[in-house]
């Protein structure tokens, strides 16, 4: 329908995808649907996982929770750091476009590889103690939203949504705590976050 609408189609990301060319040809319908599905599912799944991860992390750390209530300007850095420690997206698959060496391992062009973002964001050579929460880390080292040509196109929106959710949650509560006797149940790979999380909010 959008292609048929021509110049009457709304000027949005989907319409721009329909005009996008790769190697001199327009993307076909299957490619456009795949991209839009990845954007949508990636957004919904990772945002919901992220909110659970953030709430759980703060429920376990009342001092940090209170600090962020009193200094909401710290939230953007705190959110990125918490999600570096507990990644909402564990891994992604890629196909190498050229031969590359990673560590001492040779990988030929055209190989299928799995990138473990959660592991990269806990690399001791970059982050020292990867479990230590620090607001002064170099944000360019954090691969929460990927990097290069595969950087998440929704990163600015995701950051905005997470900041607003946490601002509102902290502004309208004075305590977020775990429910005694109801331990959280972690999601099963390839998902992240929690499949069940009980919190008491006052």
Placement of each model-derived feature along the sequence:
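Cytochrome P450
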Residues: 1-202
